[in-house]
Amino acid sequence: IAHVDHGKTTLVDCLLQQSGTLDRRSAGAERIMDSNDQERERGITILAKNTAIRYGDYRINIVDTPGHADFGGEVERVLSMVDSVLLLVDAVDGPMPQTRFVTAKAFARGLRPIVVVNKVDRPGARPDWVVDQVFDLFDNLGATDEQLDFPIVFASAIQGIAGLDHEAMADDMAPLFDAIIREVPAPKVDERGPLQLQVSALDYNSYVGVIGVGRITRGRLAPNTPVAVVDSEGGQRNG
């Protein structure tokens, strides 16, 4: 989550490429998650989209969200699907109006952000000042002590590098991957109960039709499992 143009989609591209998730056809492509024609034309993310990457023994689910204020509802909709957020902040600009909006929404759900100070390679970058500004923002939003003790990763998504110290960067994004594994709690799910999944996003594939995307809160998914789809009015249909 972040203000528009602070580098979310570029970061996701970088994580996908460095994790080896992409096939050879997609390697080196830009704005991989922005498949919508309007998004590619305007160069911004409009719809929130999810993907998963493998890193070592872990599967990390990632949702790329819009930063433009006009599409803030997309951010709210998908926060129910995640256990933490990467809050990207530009190393020159610091927190911006939409940074405050998305952070407040994350706090409202009790999430503890990992702060990613992005674009540390920009001329005029002032990462230490940005960290202080983020702390002040969190404090003004009523963050808990745990949320105020936020982990920080410095990065340049365009160069594909990250580090815990902006003066001693690694040559890849491993410090960010490691921070995600270290800081983000595993999902709390009752695996033995009956299946329950809240659909937060819809996709479409010409082969399988409509795809419901959401978070499993109970049980397990298995092929050919009969399910009941319940709408917001309480109506039910079997599928």
Describe each region flagged by the PLM.
Residues 1-89, 93-95, 102-103, 129, ...:
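P-loop NTPase switch module centered on the Walker A-proximal segment
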Residues 6, 72, 123-128, 163-171:
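Ordered, soluble secondary-structure elements with a strong preference for glycine-centered loop motifs
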Residues 9-10, 114, 132-133, 171, ...:
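Hydrophobic regular secondary-structure detector
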Residues 68-69, 120, 158-161:
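A short, flexible beta-alpha/helix-coil linker loop
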Residues 79, 85-147:
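Conserved C-terminal guanine-recognition region of P-loop GTPase G domains, centered on the G4
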Residues 138-239:
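Conserved catalytic-core segments of large NTP-driven translation/proteostasis enzymes
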